[in-house]
Regions:
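Surface-exposed extracellular loop regions of Gram-negative outer-membrane beta-barrel proteins
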Residues: 226, 268-272, 324-333, 376-392, ...
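Short acidic/polar hinge/loop motifs at secondary-structure boundaries
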Residues: 92-119
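Conserved C-terminal beta-signal and adjacent last beta-strands/turns
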Residues: 163-169, 211-214, 357-358, 413, ...
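Outer membrane beta-barrel strand-and-loop segments of large Gram-negative receptors
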Residues: 292-305, 346-354, 450-456, 462, ...
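Periplasmic-side early beta-strands and strand-to-turn transitions of outer-membrane beta-barrels
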Residues: 123-124, 136, 142-145, 149, ...
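Gram-negative outer-membrane beta-barrel transporters
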Residues: 360-366, 374, 481-485, 506-601, ...
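Extracytoplasmic beta-strand/coil segments of soluble accessory domains associated
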Residues: 45-92, 96
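N-terminal periplasmic "start-of-domain" segments of outer-membrane beta-barrel proteins
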Residues: 10-41, 66-71
Length: 666
């Protein structure tokens, strides 16, 4: 599953609408998930979860997570649900234009050939948003795969991807459907008549057409997705949908010939959310907010020029993105109807230029890069009206703001022997606030979080050192790192319910009022270990560990947070897996994930207990390309705490779920 990116370029696939991995990436922390790992995954974020400390904001996968908490972070230092990692598919960002989260249902694993997880490593060629790193998805170029499976609680999944030729065109098509009746997250004795299952219906489809043009390749891709899900209580649900279009022209680098890429893309998204207030005994709910229309659109352009000569590889590039969107809501439910409306949104943009270079001299690899970005937020507004009289309640139009950010990175790697290597790196990165953070308040149960149009970009600096050993039977990697986030965007508690507060309005008993703020800094030091052993033919053992001690320094902005841990950031996390082929047609595998306790709030008052989950799978090959399998997720039915309210009501992750299915790979 894990390996360093090769220093020597892989064999060039002429149908790929992407440049090959840059040689300089080997100087940074990169984990590669291969096709075998993706073959066993039903959801991409679950496959990424095999890497310690990588995951969504809460201890939930995208199977049960609200769209707004599906943002990804690659180290346990992110203080909110906004994604701190940039996720791209062949160069096109998948992060939502409005909120920065990722709707993972839009990317069935069957449509991918591999994934590179770049932990930290700086903004580099990736662009804004790569604060804790980047996830680089590679779409399938050849062959195909499909999966059909059914599971407990009305679960079913059908997904497939294929390729073929149509005259001079090469096509790649992928589609997926998934549903589940879900589980009830709150359990007795806390559960009441208002608690409901986290049901889900999701679908996606994409088509890519590749046209060779001399030594270059022109690729056009279109995609659509939609998901509907319950939120666990009566009257609360969410629906997310979107489209993506991209056009990419690529020329692969060759001996003595430069390579280049020019890409334009457009994404649209919409989100609907219904939020409720829950009675103290959870016997009933009342509507609190209806986010009925959240249209957002993003456009992007990027280009790169890469050359290689005499062991020196260089890349020059530009990257520009623009997003606009707004939320339309009804709130303040009184007398059986909503009494107020809200329109809030604006526009953000970022544009940058960068230069990257790497040089190989004997056992040494040296890599570095410099980047300059201009960011801006403009045309912001938050307008609230009384629905009966149409009178203005709030008309807030914050001033336009902009700035520049310089990012840099430097890495070195030395081969100490045919098996051992050592590396060191220093880097910086930044993430501008999303439209969601700037302009949209939100509600979860009785807790309310206010927006803040004055947020400035988060900036991360870091250093790390690492060693690696690679042999035919044992791979070992170890990394020590220190990261610091300046102007960290934190949901800061500023009030307790019951009470009426400016802008936010009424906060019920047991609820809290928070506001997004640039609350000082987060400093983290950590250790990452990964081991993969192949003691004999047909047996592979893997284990990995992450230890991250992250602490907040709230400074004068939020002194009450100083010394505390970021919300939902455990110190310890570990994974282990075994793949065994006891007979030619049989494969047995098991995976375990453990993490220490974490906190569900900024004040570290809501404690979520440590969690250990184990999953197991047995697969029987029926033919060279067809297999039947059975899998038990959360085999021992562990209680995994995912959230806690101000009154102590705990939500849990899914119980044991057994799946059976057929998979074909060709």
């Amino acid at each position: 599953m894990m390996q360093d990116p090769p220093v020597v370029l892989d064999e060039v696939v002429v149908t790929a609408p992407r440049l090959p991995a840059a040689e300089g990436e080997a100087a940074f922390s990169v984990i590669r998930l291969d096709g075998a790992t993706l073959d066993r995954a039903t959801r991409l974020d679950e496959a990424l979860g095999q890497v310690p400390a990588v995951g969504l904001f809460r201890r939930t996968s995208s199977l049960t997570a609200n769209p707004t908490t599906q943002g990804l972070s690659l180290r346990a230092i992110a203080p909110t649900g906004a994604g701190r990692a940039l996720v791209t598919l062949d160069g096109v960002p998948l992060n939502d234009p409005f909120g920065g989260w990722v709707i993972w249902a839009q990317v069935p694993p069957e449509g991918l050939s591999g994934v590179d997880v770049v932990r930290a490593g700086g903004t580099g060629p990736y662009g804004a948003g790569a604060l804790t790193g980047s996830v680089l998805l590679r779409e399938r170029d050849t062959d195909g795969a499909w999966t059909a499976a059914i599971g407990e609680r009305g679960s079913a999944r059908l997904a497939g991807s294929g390729t073929g030729d149509l005259g001079p065109l090469r096509w790649v098509a992928t589609a997926g459907l998934e549903r589940t009746d879900g589980h009830v997250p709150v359990r007795p004795p806390d559960a009441g008549a208002a608690d409901r299952p986290l049901d889900l219906e999701a679908g996606s489809a994409s088509l890519r057409l590749d046209l060779p043009m001399g030594g270059a390749l022109l690729s056009a891709r279109g995609a659509v997705f939609q998901e509907r899900r319950g939120s666990g209580v009566e009257g609360s649900d969410a629906e997310a949908s979107g489209t993506a279009l991209s056009l990419t022209a690529t020329r692969q680098p060759d001996t003595g010939q430069p390579g280049w890429r020019v890409q334009i893309w457009r994404r649209t998204s919409d989100l609907q959310n219904r939020f409720v207030a829950t009675a103290p005994d959870r016997s009933s709910t009342s509507l609190a907010n209806h986010q009925f229309h959240t249209p957002a659109t993003a456009w992007g352009l990027n280009a790169a020029w890469r050359t290689k000569r005499d062991g020196l590889e260089t890349e020059l590039g530009v990257d520009a993105r623009r997003a606009e969107g707004e939320t339309n809501e009804r709130y303040r439910f009184m007398g059986g109807e909503f009494t107020r409306s809200r329109q809030a949104g604006g526009e953000t943009s970022v544009a940058g230029v960068y230069a990257e270079a790497s040089a190989t001299r004997g056992p040494w690899l040296m890599a570095g890069g410099l980047r300059l970005d201009h960011w801006s937020t403009r045309d912001g507004l938050r307008v609230e009206r009384d629905l009966q009289s149409d009178a203005l309640v709030l008309d807030d139009r914050p001033s336009d703001r902009s700035g520049e950010v310089v990012s840099a990175r430097l890495g070195v790697r030395r081969a100490l022997s045919p098996e051992w290597s050592a590396r060191a790196a220093a880097y910086s990165a930044f993430r501008p606030a999303t439209l969601n953070e700037l302009h949209r308040p939100f509600r979860v149960g009785n807790d309310i979080t206010e927006a803040n149009a004055a947020l400035v970009p988060e900036q991360l600096t870091g250093i790390e050192v690492g060693v690696a050993r690679e042999t035919g039977q044992l791979d070992l990697r170890a990394t020590l790192f220190a990261n610091r986030i300046e102007d960290a965007i934190v949901n800061v508690t500023i009030g307790q319910g019951p009470g009426v507060f400016p802008r936010a309005g009424f906060v019920p008993a047991g609820g809290v009022l928070r506001e997004r703020q640039n609350a000082g800094t987060i400093e983290a030091v950590g250790l990452e270990l990964e081991v993969e052993a192949r003691p004999r033919e047909g047996l592979t053992l893997r284990t990995a560990l992450s230890a991250t001690d992250a602490r907040v320094d709230g400074g004068s902005q939020a002194p009450q947070l100083t010394g505390l841990r970021p919300a939902q950031a455990p110190i310890w996390s570990a994974t282990a897996s075994v793949d065994w082929t006891p007979a030619p047609d049989w494969t047995v595998s098991a995976d375990a994930r453990w993490e220490s306790r974490r906190f569900d709030d900024d004040l570290n008052s809501r404690v979520l207990d440590p969690a250990l989950t184990v999953s197991a799978r047995a697969e029987r090959r029926l033919s060279p390309d067809l297999a039947a399998w059975v899998e038990a997720v959360n085999l021992f039915d562990a209680d995994v705490e995912t959230a806690e309210t101000g009154t102590g009501v705990v939500s849990f992750g899914p119980p044991r779920t057994v799946w059976i299915g057929l998979s074909r790979r060709w």
